[in-house]
Amino acid sequence: MQENFKIFDDNLLLFESMLSDIRKSKQSVWIEIFRFNKDAMGEKFRSLLLEKLKEGIEVKLLVDAWGTGRDKTFFEPLIKEGAEVRIYRKMKFGKAFLAKNHCRNHRKLVIIDSEIAYIGSSNISAYCLNWRELNVRIKDDALLAILRRSFKDSFRSFERYSFKNIGSKRHLHSGEWVFIQDFPNIYRQKIKTKYERMISKAKSEIIIETPYFLPGHNLRKHLCEAVQRGVNTIVVMPIHSDVKFVDIIRRHYLGILHQAG
């Protein structure tokens, strides 16, 4: 089982592994990514994808309009060779600017030949090479089936986002795996509910590692209650994230949680 999973916390090693697997691909490369930067690393991936297209490999690419931009010029060489490139939720202006532009696709998923997948926190970017990230290389058939289905859902409905889109909300199950398809919601996010339930049932230890820690009322309540039950509770975060505003706001929550233990 363990040989089916490999964890990366170094982006350079991650990208080297991704590029190596893409180079060996025989059938398809699917990429769903928030930010595909037009920098040295982005060009390296684009160049390799172009080579694979010329070999007859299927390439599908879904990028987010906020993270990557809505202009497809950078991807034109791929499109000309037959790649399917889609932009998730192009930016809306006017009255819809604040109402809809927060609905982003922040996923980072790469699937190669339907046999290998990468999922985690890293974008395709040279900018984040020195960041501490967490990504997993997967060769588990059950989990790959879930990830393929999730990618197909996103790729098919890239311009039809809706709060009422049931397909975007469902949990995908396979064996012991549960994959929660979540998305920005002004009412409630299923992943938050899942976290709260897991924390409320914790008996010995809770470890949270995140760059942005802004827990809502319910999550703060469950964390404090866990400490009171004797659960060893640890939150790991950077002293300074790349979003200064978040660093300022989180001080309030850290004070409350620190006092609780």
How does the language model describe each region?
Residues 1-87, 92-261:
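Charged, low-complexity intrinsically disordered terminal segments
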